[in-house]
């Protein structure tokens, strides 16, 4: 087998009809974890329903339907391989909770793949003021997804088909647009593709002899190639934050007979090891980690990205819960936030938001009502420059610096220190009305919390 390939996460963004599903389906289909039998079954069903022309998207549709019904699908279906990477598609938009997922970050994407449709009138609809192309790209950038690949899709349906002129026009427009957001177009691979016909997906297309390939220039090494798969292969490998102090937001806490209390969650930063003394915030409980396991196997250490369960001594299920954060008691332990300052972008709110507004925030695994205590300044959402001090209200499209106060104890961090704990979605009326990035946290001085006997013993022994 040789060395394991590096795992990377991508998020696929773009307007509804840009062909994201077909393109993604094509990659999964040709390089992915779906076995031949399943593919044949899908093809047969698609043909019976007269959806033969829809087979790649159909693959994704089947997966999505199962995902939405809460059937935990075999996640290998959302994976495919390039020569260098195992790629996981962490979310495909069109999924109701896409924006929320992208922000609360079931995982952080290493790269965004923006699909734009080249068909007559389609590109214009996608990038128009109310098209989703802009919003998705802006979100990706705001949330720290700094690498981007652009697939100019449906090249087979331009006028005339595979038109170089149309492709160049789109590249020019998208470059201007992503530059305004903050991406540097020189670092972005643009690839003319047909997710349906397969042009420039895995193999160079014979239909576009004019396309001499894509090139990116960046300080960590330049790259060039022809296909979308090659562009994915040239994503810069992520650096996982093992050197930071531990932060592990809890997804659940189980009580397991004969073992005891087992919190479960994903290590976001740092390392979790048996024998460590951890503090849970905001509840301020400190205890010793007895064992750590993943997929029912004991680990000597858990690293960022690992979903683990860990057994803690002398702590009841009532002491800790989902949304709490575990950290190393001796190395910048997590603390309750009395309040925090954030930069927010209002996405879709029907009215005006003023001080006192108290929607629910989804930040890492916490889900807590927070009050917009003070609107400090309105800013330009691209440059971050101040537009006005102390605005009276905010409306859709506005960006602002806001002081927020949680309604219940909560643990968050600044985006610059701990990115996964420093971005949030604002939910109201069953939709995401705003997104935010935390600039600074006012930490509550922790009183004497609960320190278990095993923690005291472990601390003495050290």
Swiss-Prot record:
The modification N6-acetyllysine is found at residues 165, 172, 273, 392, 439. Residues 70-74 are annotated as: G2. GTP binds at residues 14-21, 153-156, 194-196. It is found in: Cytoplasm; Nucleus; Nucleus, Nucleolus; Cell membrane. This is Elongation factor 1-alpha 1. It comes from Rattus norvegicus. The gene is Eef1a1. Residues 91-94 are annotated as: G3. The modification N,N,N-trimethylglycine is found at residue 2. Pfam families: GTP-eEF1A_C (PF22594), GTP_EFTU (PF00009), GTP_EFTU_D2 (PF03144). There is a cross-link at residue 385 (Glycyl lysine isopeptide (Lys-Gly) (interchain with G-Cter in ubiquitin)).
């Amino acid at each position: 087998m040789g060395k394991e390939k590096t795992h990377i996460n991508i998020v696929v963004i773009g307007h509804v009809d840009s062909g994201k599903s077909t393109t993604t389906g094509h990659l999964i289909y040709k390089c992915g974890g779906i076995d031949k039998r399943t593919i044949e079954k899908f093809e047969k069903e698609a043909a019976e329903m007269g959806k033969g022309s829809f087979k790649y998207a159909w693959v994704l549709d089947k997966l999505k339907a199962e995902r939405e019904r809460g059937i935990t699908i075999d996640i290998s279906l959302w994976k495919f391989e390039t020569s260098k990477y195992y790629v996981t598609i962490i979310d495909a938009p069109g999924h109701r909770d896409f924006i929320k997922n992208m922000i609360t970050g079931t995982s952080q994407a290493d790269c965004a793949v923006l699909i734009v449709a080249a068909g007559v009138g389609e590109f214009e609809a996608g990038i128009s003021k109310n098209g989703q192309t802009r919003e998705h790209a802006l979100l990706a950038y705001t949330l720290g997804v700094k690498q981007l690949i652009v697939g100019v899709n449906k090249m087979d349906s331009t006028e005339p088909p595979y038109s170089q002129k149309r492709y160049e026009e789109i590249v020019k427009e998208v470059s201007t647009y992503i530059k305004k957001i903050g991406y540097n177009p020189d670092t972005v691979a643009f690839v003319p593709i047909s997710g349906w016909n397969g042009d420039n997906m895995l193999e160079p297309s014979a239909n576009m002899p004019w396309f001499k390939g894509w090139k990116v220039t960046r300080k960590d090494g330049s790259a060039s190639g022809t296909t979308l798969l090659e562009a994915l292969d040239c994503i810069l490998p992520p650096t996982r934050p093992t050197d930071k102090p531990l932060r592990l937001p809890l997804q659940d806490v189980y009580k397991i007979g004969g073992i005891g209390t087992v919190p479960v969650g994903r290590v976001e930063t740092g390392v979790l090891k048996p024998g460590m003394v951890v503090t849970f915030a905001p509840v301020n409980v400190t205890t010793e980690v007895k064992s750590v396991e993943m997929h029912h196997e004991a680990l000597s250490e858990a690293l960022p990205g690992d979903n683990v369960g860990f057994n803690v001594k002398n702590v009841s299920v009532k002491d800790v819960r989902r949304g709490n954060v575990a950290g190393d008691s001796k190395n910048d332990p997590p603390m309750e936030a009395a309040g925090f300052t954030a930069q927010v972008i209002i996405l879709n709110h029907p009215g005006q938001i003023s001080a006192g507004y108290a929607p629910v925030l989804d930040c890492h695994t916490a889900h807590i009502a927070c009050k917009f205590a003070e609107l400090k300044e309105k800013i330009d959402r691209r440059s971050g420059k101040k537009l006005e001090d102390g605005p009276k209200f905010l409306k859709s499209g506005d960006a602002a610096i806001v002081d927020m106060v949680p309604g219940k104890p909560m643990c968050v961090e600044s985006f610059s220190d701990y990115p996964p704990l420093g971005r949030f979605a604002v939910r109201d009326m069953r939709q995401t009305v705003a997104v935010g990035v935390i600039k600074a946290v006012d930490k509550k001085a922790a009183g004497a919390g609960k320190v278990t006997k095993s923690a005291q013993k472990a601390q003495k022994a050290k």
